[in-house]
Structures are given as structure tokens and as C-alpha cells.
């Protein structure tokens, strides 16, 4: 199948075949369209995600290699366990989604710029209100110390971004997420791109066909949507 860049319609939410994604830049499949809930849901169901900067058109990607976290392979270091014992935290889900995504945006601006544009903020807040985007919050002494957010589709959590205001608190958010997903029969976490930080936590990289096969298999994982009712996660690190 010919590799070429497609221009999406504003009315048709369909995507071209993933096999058409470019080799350079790796995985770029299409531009344009919108960030409507229906299009976002269709994208994630097919292993596609949006990634672009404020001054760029909407760009849709499916890279040739995909970073994932197999839930049973998540790595917890001894130092992280010691840190948690010395500095306990409270973990919640969906209690502060807007604060989490805004903190992710601010942290990226402070480091290397951000792809969380104003349109992305609006789109993911809408997805949260519709029940498909979720957040994990880590609190210490009543302050939001770290967290992450992403999209849950069937048995796959598609991680979008994480942040920390205090040492190790993004790792603690990830650890809590992994344990919570395991409790509820989820399949794996899609990290989208290879990331040294996540690789240190046990993420691996697999080729696109293997990823798509796992994504398809995840449709058979029945996950109770009630797992995302806003709540405190008790004994989540046990």
C-alpha cells in the first residue's frame, strides 16, 4: 500500500489505513479534521493519536514502533518503595482532571515546550466529561504532588502525559495506575512513543503490527466503567 499523507475531512471521522503512515516523519498518517469526541475515540480504537504544536495543523500518528507497558512487567525500584514508606501519599482517580492536565501543560512549557495546545485541552476535558479520559492524582499533605491522564478504550489505557511537583510523584501515579488496571482486568498501557523515563519503569517497544494485534485483543477485555468513579484508592500500593 502506498505511503502518503492524507488530508482529513471535517465531517468524516474515518482514517486512512495505518499502513499508509509515512516512514519520515515516522508514523505521520494524516493532518486536519478536528478533535471531536467521535474522532478521538475512533483514532484511539485504531492505534492513532493526535500530536502537534500550537502553530501546526492537527497531525495524526501511528509510529512504526510503539512504547507499551505490560502490567505485569512494571518495574518498582527499591528506592521508590523506600521513598513511599518515608513520604506517604494519598491517591485518587478523576478527582482533579482539569488540574492534572493543566499541570502537565505547565510542566512541559517549563521544560521543552508543549504539544498540549488550547484545542487539546478542550478536547480532552470534553473526553473526560464524556467518560473516556481519566486522571490519577497523587496528593501529599493536601497538595497535588503529581499525576497523569489518558484515554481508556476497552482494556487499554492510552497514557497522554504526566507531571510531578514533588520527587517521584509521577512514578507513584504510574504505579497506582498499573495496580488499579490490574485489579480491573485491563490489558496494557499504550505509551505511544519510546520514552527513556518510562523504559526505566519497565516499558518496552514493539513493532506496529504487534501493537495493533494487542489492541485488537484488548477489545475482549471487559473492564467495568465503574472503576473510574471518582474515589480514593485505598491500599493501592499493596
Curated annotation (Swiss-Prot):
SUPFAM superfamilies given in the database record: Acyl-CoA N-acyltransferases (Nat)
Lipoprotein listed as a keyword: no
GO molecular function: leucyl-tRNA--protein transferase activity
Subcellular location: Cytoplasm
Pfam families in UniProt: Leu_Phe_trans
GO biological processes: protein catabolic process
EC number(s) from the headed UniProt entry: 2.3.2.6
CC terms in the record's Gene Ontology section: cytoplasm
InterPro entries in alphabetical order: Acyl_CoA_acyltransferase (IPR016181), Leu/Phe-tRNA_Trfase (IPR004616), Leu/Phe-tRNA_Trfase_C (IPR042203), Leu/Phe-tRNA_Trfase_N (IPR042221)
Function: Functions in the N-end rule pathway of protein degradation where it conjugates Leu, Phe and, less efficiently, Met from aminoacyl-tRNAs to the N-termini of proteins containing an N-terminal arginine or lysine.
NCBIfam families, per the entry: aat (TIGR00667)
Family: Belongs to the L/F-transferase family.
Protein name as it appears in the record: Leucyl/phenylalanyl-tRNA--protein transferase
Amino acid at each position: 500500500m502506498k505511503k502518503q499523507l492524507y488530508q482529513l475531512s471535517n465531517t468524516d471521522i474515518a482514517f486512512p489505513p495505518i499502513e499508509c503512515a509515512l516512514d519520515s516523519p515516522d508514523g505521520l498518517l494524516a493532518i486536519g479534521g478536528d478533535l471531536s469526541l467521535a474522532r478521538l475515540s475512533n483514532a484511539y480504537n485504531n492505534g492513532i493519536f493526535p500530536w502537534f504544536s500550537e502553530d501546526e495543523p492537527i497531525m495524526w500518528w501511528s509510529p512504526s514502533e510503539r512504547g507499551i507497558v505490560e502490567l505485569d512487567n512494571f518495574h518498582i525500584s527499591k528506592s521508590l518503595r523506600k521513598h513511599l514508606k518515608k513520604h506517604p501519599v494519598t491517591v485518587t482517580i478523576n478527582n482533579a482532571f482539569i488540574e492534572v492536565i493543566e499541570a502537565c501543560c505547565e510542566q512541559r512549557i517549563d521544560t521543552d515546550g508543549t504539544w498540549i495546545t488550547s484545542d487539546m485541552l478542550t478536547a480532552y476535558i470534553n473526553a473526560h466529561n464524556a467518560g473516556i479520559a481519566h486522571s490519577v492524582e497523587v496528593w501529599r499533605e493536601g497538595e497535588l504532588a503529581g499525576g497523569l491522564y489518558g484515554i481508556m478504550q476497552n482494556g487499554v489505557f492510552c497514557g497522554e502525559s504526566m507531571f510531578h511537583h514533588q520527587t517521584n510523584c509521577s512514578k507513584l501515579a504510574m504505579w497506582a495506575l498499573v495496580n488499579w488496571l490490574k485489579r480491573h482486568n485491563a490489558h496494557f498501557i499504550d505509551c505511544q512513543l519510546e520514552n527513556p523515563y518510562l523504559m526505566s519503569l519497565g516499558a518496552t517497544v514493539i513493532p506496529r503490527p504487534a501493537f495493533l494485534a494487542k489492541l485488537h485483543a484488548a477489545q475482549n477485555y471487559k473492564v467495568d466503567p465503574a472503576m473510574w468513579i471518582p474515589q480514593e484508592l485505598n491500599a493501592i500500593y499493596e
